[in-house]
Amino acid sequence: MSSRFARWAPGALMVAALALDAEVVRAADAAEPGAGTAPAEVAAREYEQVMGLTPNLANGAKVYLTCAVCHRPEGWGSPDGDYPQIAGQLRTVLIKQLADIRARNRDNPLMYPFSVPRVLGGAQEIADVTAYVSQLPMTADNGKGPGTDLELGKRLYAENCAKCHGDQGEGNAKDHIPAVAGQHYLYQVRQFDAIRAGRRKNADPKMTRQIHGFTPREESAVLDYTSRLVPAPEKLAKPGWLNPDFPHYVRPPMPGFPGPSTTRPAASAPATR
């Protein structure tokens, strides 16, 4: 990566991002193809277009600079649940979610301004950045749950989740079902609640039905268990690894994310509804 990209501090880029006010976003929307078409159809067309392109990893690293502001240069997100670990995620999943967000088939007000074509780029940039992110090594130091009901969580996962997400949480690239191994517990809680409440427009209806009757205890147990599934060894970063494509990037402290070698307290269970 060019040093002029790597030297950017995240604060400077965040200030630039905040300049994307409502007028700019409306202008981006007006320029997008498919106006008046159902968001799911727009996203599906872009997904197919991206899948037909050959990715350029070097350009993907440059595009990823925008993403690193929130997801960090390593793609590890934040254990407080604000940002997911996207490093090592299945590429088909990354493409689908990005296409859904920019087509507004998935509501994500924080990420949407970063995803619009005039900021992120077109289909080629999606091809490039998703290929880049999918090959980043993961951290096993993701946020975990309270650790109090793991046997129940294991049983619930086997009965309700493993068929789609895989026995080890590895996901399914063909059906763009995300890998959940190594994902932050609190991020999973947030998405679980959004899916069950119908706030995730692009959620699989089968999953919405599957989790509808979960009690707060069951939710905490299964997501705690899932957060402790460890990705395959070849997908994990070595101790002390930092993304070499961002050698001068200023990595600010992030709440709840002390670093790869530091032990953090487990999260508490979600509040009873």
What are these regions (language model features)?
Residues 31-64, 77-80, 131-156, 249-257, ...:
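Electrostatic cytochrome c docking/interface patches
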Residues 1-12:
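Bacterial N-terminal signal peptides that target proteins for export
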Residues 50, 57, 68, 72-106, ...:
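Gly/Gly-Pro-rich "capping" loops immediately C-terminal to redox-active cysteine motifs
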Residues 17-26:
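C-terminal segment of classical bacterial N-terminal signal peptides
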Residues 60, 67-73, 129, 153, ...:
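The canonical Cys-X-X-Cys-His
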Residues 28-30, 79-85, 101-136, 141-148, ...:
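Axial heme c-ligation environment in periplasmic c-type cytochrome domains
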Residues 218-273:
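Long hydrophobic alpha-helical segments typical of transmembrane helices together
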